[in-house]
Amino acid sequence: MNFREKYGQWGIVLGATEGIGKASAFELAKRGMDVILVGRRKEALEELAKAIHEETGKEIRVLPQDLSEYDAAERLIEATKDLDMGVIEYVACLHAMGQYNKVDYAKYEQMYRVNIRTFSKLLHHYIGEFKERDRGAFITIGSLSGWTSLPFCAEYAAEKAYMMTVTEGVAYECANTNVDVMLLSAGSTITPTWLKNKPSDPKAVAAAMYPEDVIKDGFEQLGKKFTYLAGELNREKMKENNAMDRNDLIAKLGKMFDHMA
């Protein structure tokens, strides 16, 4: 599918520097879109922009922005107000692992600003813009962490659950329009962050996917599903989890990350 023809000229990837964000930026360009890269590290973004342009020939812009800043959403909206925006992809997330009370609360406040506040403002703005012109797409990158309580990662799991339920609800509200909204959930994905905190569960390691595969799989579902979990092994794992007693599931997941205690 040519995203430019269906949704508009520009795609923007929030959290584009590496992993799923980087893979998304390449894939949007391959699907015909000019792309705006948003992240904190300007030099890394510029290097990525050059690589995407050289491979695809598309126009790539760099927009350095810390999404935890109070006015981050307003700055991004202002920067894109005169562009034909077609696809918004919110990949960015902050997380902290460890016993809940041992994490500095300032870290949780920073996570909230990235995972909820900036995300919500951008979702609210662009869905309104897209529905007004009856064209566009918003993709939220979710995580298996948001599908259940997760010991030693409790705040992050709760915030990903928020992103999941809001996106799915808005997706249904847009069902009878030409605006496509989807939650694309990734399980274990081989990114720098994942490698730092690799789980001890062999099944989770075996199910790990490369970012490029997550995105190619997920993009094929845009416009077809409200919510999608990439990877057959991840879907099998989720069926197993859903069949468990919730108390047993929480204990099982906690044991996977006991080393974080």
Curated annotation (Swiss-Prot):
The keyword Lipid metabolism applies. Optimum temperature is 40 degrees Celsius. No activity is detected above 60 degrees Celsius. Its EC number is 1.1.1.201. The record marks K160 as: Lowers pKa of active site Tyr. Keywords: Bile acid catabolism, Lipid degradation, Lipid metabolism, NADP, Nucleotide-binding, Oxidoreductase, Steroid metabolism. The record marks S143 as: Transition state stabilizer. PANTHER family: RH59310P. GO terms for molecular function: 7-beta-hydroxysteroid dehydrogenase (NADP+) activity; nucleotide binding. The lineage of its organism: Bacteria, Bacillati, Bacillota, Clostridia, Eubacteriales. Belongs to the short-chain dehydrogenases/reductases (SDR) family. One of its GO terms (biological process) is bile acid catabolic process. It comes from Clostridium sardiniense (Clostridium absonum). NADP(+) binds at T17, E18, G19, I20, G21, R40, R41, D66, L67. This is 7beta-hydroxysteroid dehydrogenase.
